[in-house]
Regions:
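The feature captures the beta-strand-to-loop junction immediately N-terminal to the Walker
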Residues: 19-21, 315-317
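Helix-to-loop junction immediately C-terminal to a conserved catalytic motif
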Residues: 34, 330
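Conserved ABC ATPase signature
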Residues: 122-126, 130
């Protein structure tokens, strides 16, 4: 079975993070909560599941959607309307709500998530973070009591991910909803407080602890979840991580002078980064320019060289052109101008 003997209580107003490696059953559990499992994805379900007083296995996706609002990792898969406003109002239109009331509720939901100035925009004109806001507004028009986020940071850069977590925090404070976040980017989610972390592995719950208590253990590392980097640095420096040191957030960590001295000493004596020798050029990009539309260039005069045997990371915020650059190098798109040379050949 994908899930085995899950026993879990989530209380009104809580913010709970469900973490675990890929394939551990996080999204399957989310699908049980919102009704996708087993109503949309056939399967056998045993045991009991009550969602906001509703017997979930004997209910329906439609009935559960009035209690649970789900935001998926790929917001593009949730867009229905041709504009932001239409998309937010989709559920209201299905309930045949009068237009005047529908416009008012749509505007209110848009204001809650800070997207009110984009109601006439088409989905493809939005950034990744803005799309997440629209998806969130679309489920909030039903005034659900539970907001379920299934890997909401998967397609977002770190900065936009933090903004998304801040938005979730603000929405919960304003609406007092229960928030369940499915995610393995632990450090980004802990940018704002959570009440509990549910750690899953191989379809089972391995731990159900307050963040300070879980981060003081080695359970995350043992189960393939990267702990916050500041904790890794502290461990390398020989600092003992204890729950009373409040390790859940870098700003809340309690340090004493001995801990500070250990970290400073480790930092000063860590091995220097090795300088890479100049390898023979393998891939050369010269003055590469490309745009999906004539008036707007996604890449402009990009020039770089990657040597044989090098390992290179291309980073940047959403919309910076990383994927477009990869498509051009692979030949999936044709550049407007410039050269791409592989082993000296165009």
């Amino acid at each position: 079975p994908t899930l085995k003997e899950i026993n879990l209580d989530i209380y009104p107003g809580e913010r709970v993070l469900i973490a675990g490696p890929s394939g551990c059953g996080k999204s399957t559990l989310a699908g049980c909560i919102n009704g996708l499992n087993p109503f949309s994805n056939p399967g056998e379900c045993t045991g009991e599941l009550t969602v906001d007083g509703v017997n979930a296995p004997k209910s329906s996706i439609f009935e559960l959607s009035a209690h649970v609002g789900t935001v998926l990792q790929d917001p593009d898969g949730q867009f229905i309307g041709l504009t932001v406003g239409e998309d937010i109002a989709f559920a209201l239109e299905n309930s045949c709500m009068p237009q005047e009331e529908m416009h008012e509720i749509t505007r209110h939901a848009a204001e809650l998530v800070g997207i009110q100035d984009h109601l006439d925009y088409a989905p493809h004109e939005l950034s990744g973070g803005q799309k997440q806001r629209v998806s969130l507004a679309g489920v909030m028009v039903d005034q659900v009591k539970i907001l379920l986020f299934d890997e909401p940071l998967a397609n977002l850069d770190p900065a936009t991910g933090k903004q998304t977590i801040e938005l979730i925090d603000e929405i919960q404070e304003k609406t007092d909803t229960t928030v369940v976040i499915i995610e393995h980017r632990l450090e980004d989610v802990l940018w704002r407080d959570v009440d509990r972390i549910i750690l899953m592995g191989e379809g089972q719950i391995l731990a159900d602890l307050h963040p300070d208590k879980l981060l003081a253990t080695s359970l995350l590392e043992k189960n393939g979840i990267r702990e916050p980097l500041y904790l890794t640095a502290m461990r390398y420096a020989g600092v003992e991580i204890l729950p009373e040191k409040k390790p859940a957030h870098v700003d809340s960590v309690v340090w004493d002078e001995a801990d500070r001295a250990k970290v400073v000493n480790w930092f000063r004596h860590r091995p220097a980064a090795q300088a890479f020798s100049q390898n023979e050029p393998l891939l050369e990009v010269k003055n590469l320019t490309f745009g999906y539309e004539k008036k707007q260039k996604t890449l402009q005069d990009v020039t770089l060289t990657i040597g044989k045997g090098e390992m290179v990371s291309i980073v940047g915020k959403n919309g910076a052109g990383k994927s477009t650059f990869s498509k051009l190098v692979c030949g999936f798109e044709t550049p407007d101008s410039g050269e791409i040379l592989f082993q000296g050949k165009d």
